[in-house]
Curated annotation (Swiss-Prot):
Changing L176E: Strong decrease in GTPase activity. Changing I289E: Strong decrease in GTPase activity. Essential cell division protein that forms a contractile ring structure (Z ring) at the future cell division site. The regulation of the ring assembly controls the timing and the location of cell division. One of the functions of the FtsZ ring is to recruit other cell division proteins to the septum to produce a new cell wall between the dividing cells. Binds GTP and shows GTPase activity. It comes from Mycobacterium tuberculosis (strain ATCC 25618 / H37Rv). This is Cell division protein FtsZ. GO terms for biological process: cell division; division septum assembly; FtsZ-dependent cytokinesis; positive regulation of cell cycle; protein polymerization; septin ring assembly. NCBIfam families: ftsZ (TIGR00065). GTP binds at G18, G19, G20, V21, N22, G105, T106, G107, E136, R140, D184. It comes from the Bacteria. One of its GO terms (cellular component) is cytoplasm. The gene is ftsZ. Changing K138A: Decrease in GTPase activity.
Length: 379
């Protein structure tokens, strides 16, 4: 008699570098379920503090466990030297998330190596990374752009969270920690919004093949997350998701949209239809739109909507945000045949804005690879 097979998708989340390892720690703290966590770093001391299921210190010979010194080449070589070990850790995965803070050493240089290995093994590979603030300096910004370009070539789908957009999320007096916490929630909920669709049963189920159909070889992706309570909650949550200030570039040309609606057992068919219709109205007429629901009674009366748009040209012009009826704006009018009906994701040029830290001191720079920790992870 043959033993029963496990037909559940195997999902692994890899945090590499100071930022990636801290991101994994935060996901574990928040109770992200159904995935295996792997932490990879050149800083052996920082790795000891990780709560990940599996820890791998790389670059033992070249860095002696002291970090990459904010040098991506050191990070790349450290990951290359540990290729066999990384491959063994990723073997058997159906989907691999690679998360890092771009601009430093280990994450910037090592993330493309990890992603390449995962993809070679046949796993659906998704990168989720942060772009540093403009005020962190030109060198770090240039390193981040090079790292993002390399990671884009190595992943099926790459989601970039631009930290400069945090400055648009509140008034001028927003605290440093509140701004970082907002980005933290985007990173966590972005991964969770995808994994929950696969691992959590819902009224409308989405399986791994559906997710793979949207994200395989999709290139750059946009991600939006929204939540709301009370009357019109689903529509409000969808509006927030598709107009998130943490999204960069325009949705024009998107060929695939993945949408998740999470709520309690009282989640109604009418409100699901409202939220899905808003996204459908905003998408390309020929786009492949897949949506599913996740029933989670711990949410109470809250509804969460996650929208991921993939397979589009980020060079297209920006559009004004879509607003539903709850936002007081006009509904989207039908476009001519062959034209986009989307007015999503208006890009905003990065600007230098004074950051009010409420008395906190923020240190930027230096050779310590701790700078690889995304700002929203710094305590």
């Amino acid at each position: 008699m043959t033993p029963p097979h496990n037909y559940l998708a195997v999902i692994k989340v890899v945090g590499i570098g100071g930022g990636g390892v801290n991101a994994v720690n935060r996901m574990i703290e928040q109770g992200l379920k159904g995935v295996e966590f792997i932490a990879i770093n050149t800083d052996a001391q920082a790795l000891l503090m990780s709560d990940a299921d599996v820890k791998l210190d790389v670059g033992r010979d070249s860095t002696r466990g002291l970090g990459a010194g904010a040098d991506p080449e050191v990070g790349r070589k450290a990951a290359e030297d540990a290729k066999d070990e990384i491959e063994e850790l990723l073997r058997g995965a159906d989907m691999v998330f690679v998360t890092a803070g771009e601009g430093g050493g280990t994450g910037t240089g090592g993330a493309p190596v990890v992603a390449s290995i995962a993809r070679k093994l046949g796993a659906l590979t998704v990168g989720v990374v942060t772009r540093p603030f403009s005020f962190e300096g030109k060198r770090r910004s240039n390193q981040a752009e090079n790292g993002i370009a390399a990671l884009r070539e190595s992943c099926d789908t790459l989601i970039v969270i631009p930290n400069d957009r945090l400055l648009q999320m509140g008034d001028a007096a927003v605290s440093l920690m509140d701004a970082f916490r907002s980005a933290d929630e985007v990173l966590l909920n972005g991964v969770q919004g995808i994994t929950d669709l696969i691992t959590t049963p819902g009224l409308i189920n989405v399986d791994f093949a559906d997710v793979k159909g949207i994200m395989s070889g999709a290139g750059t992706a946009l991600m939006g997350i929204g939540s709301a309570r009370g009357e019109g909650r689903s529509l409000k949550a969808a509006e927030i998701a598709i107009n998130s200030p943490l999204l960069e570039a325009s949705m024009e040309g998107a060929q695939g949209v993945l949408m998740s609606i999470a709520g309690g057992s009282d989640l109604g068919l009418f409100e699901i239809n409202e939220a899905a219709s808003l996204v459908q109205d905003a998408a390309h007429p020929d786009a492949n739109i897949i949506f599913g629901t996740v029933i989670d009674d711990s949410l109470g009366d809250e509804v969460r909507v996650t929208v991921i748009a993939a397979g589009f040209d980020v060079s297209g012009p920006g559009r004004k945000p879509v607003m539903g009826e709850t936002g007081g704006a006009h509904r989207i009018e039908s476009a001519k045949a062959g034209k986009l009906t989307s007015t999503l994701f208006e890009p905003v040029d990065a600007v230098s804005v004074p950051l009010h830290t409420n008395g906190a001191t923020l240190s930027i720079g230096g050779d310590d690879d701790d700078v690889d920790v995304p700002p929203f992870m710094r305590r």
